[in-house]
Amino acid sequence: MIKSKGWNWKMVEDDSNCVWKIPSIESYYLLDRWKGLGFKSFLDLGCGLGRHTVLFASNDFKTYGFDISEDGLTRTKEWLDSLDLKADLKKGDMIHLPYKDNSFDCILCRNVISHQDTEGVKQIIKELYRVLKDNGECYLTLGSKSTWGFKQTSWPLVDENTRLRMEEGPEYKTPHFYADYDLIKVLFKDFKIEFINHIEDFYESNDKTYSSFHYHVLIKKVK
């Protein structure tokens, strides 16, 4: 198992236009869904700068934020404090979560668990199962083997599903795990898979258009 490595958030500007401070589109769907299911306890796994921690805390969830980055957690706390919101923030490695069994109704980990190799991802999934309550749900994303990053052969191959990102920036030398539909079915065999979506995102940079593919997966813990 490769050593876990988080983002270098010091390289990311902290302003209102920062994409990492804007809640993802699907987080609003999850907020509505999980409220409707009567869920109360929420874990933002890999909370980064706190965009989803703040969203759920401001909507009366008992909110927990977890990240490997001290800087990310510091900036999350500052944001919460500025809004007079509360959340339980912890620093650590997601392969060993510091929470009791059956702690959470719902977990969101967007572009998070992919930052490990295959063995690490399997261990994280075990932890997700452990800390979720029965009938609790987890929404997560995984890099797709259809995306450019997996095909980027200049990035070292860690194992058959994982490459080490060598592009300069906040993710430099961070492992990136990639999956396909069949692998996802195997990885989450102990859960009920509510849905799997394969989504292509487009973005502009230096007058060029780029895209990347991710799997969006909603799972439920069932006995």
Language-model segments: which ranges?
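Class I (Rossmann-like) S-adenosyl-L-methionine-dependent methyltransferase catalytic domain
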Residues: 1-39, 48-96, 120-123, 137-223
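A short His-aromatic
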Residues: 114-116
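A short acidic, Gly/Pro-enriched loop at the edge of an enzyme's catalytic core
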Residues: 95-106
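A short glycine-rich, Lys/Arg-flanked "PGG" loop and its adjoining helix->strand segment in the class I
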Residues: 122-134
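A short beta-strand submotif of the Rossmann-like class I SAM-dependent methyltransferase core
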Residues: 109-112
